[in-house]
């Protein structure tokens, strides 16, 4: 779906859906949600005959990031992304229920014509003075 895996942090995966001359911001948001839903569905199939269930939560935000080598030549250096958009996505993942995709209002506005929402609510996240409007995705609609 056009993702770039940025890193694995413990049991978390940070994936990027980057805009390009061939891929719009809206398409990136759609593909991110599609990938999250596909991962959840794949785990449902995987878990069918398992006693110990594997579950994931998905948090998706859209926005500007700072991308590049972070660190120094003398110590650890990683090519990664940082910024408020990344932090919000991480907070959404933490706030999501197991087996669900939670998107920011920014992401929702990019794909609102192609997504069915199960629930909309506001959450308080660390580092933000105001509550964030978030949407729990029920399903994507065909483009």
Show the residue positions of the predicted features.
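Cytosolic regulatory/linker segments at or just downstream of nucleotide-handling modules
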Residues: 65-67, 89, 95-143
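An acidic- and aromatic-residue-enriched active-site/binding cleft used to recognize and process polar
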Residues: 10, 38, 106
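Structural signal for well-ordered, non-membrane alpha-helices
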Residues: 37-44, 66, 93
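Secondary-structure boundary motif
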Residues: 45-49, 94, 113
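Hydrophobic alpha-helical membrane-association signature
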Residues: 31-35, 39, 84-88
């Amino acid at each position: 779906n056009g993702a770039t895996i940025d890193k694995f942090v413990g049991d978390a995966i940070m994936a990027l859906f980057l805009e390009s001359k061939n891929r719009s911001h809206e398409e990136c948001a759609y593909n991110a949600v599609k990938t999250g839903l596909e991962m959840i569905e794949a785990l449902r199939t995987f878990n069918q005959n398992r006693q110990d269930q594997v579950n994931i939560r998905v948090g998706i935000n859209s926005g500007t990031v700072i991308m590049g080598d972070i660190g120094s030549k003398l110590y650890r250096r990683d090519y990664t992304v940082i910024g408020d958009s990344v932090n919000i996505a991480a907070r959404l993942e933490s706030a999501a229920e197991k087996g669900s995709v939670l998107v920011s209002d920014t992401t929702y506005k990019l794909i609102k014509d192609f997504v069915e929402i199960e629930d909309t609510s506001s959450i308080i996240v660390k580092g933000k003075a105001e509550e964030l409007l978030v949407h729990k995705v029920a399903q994507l609609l065909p483009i």
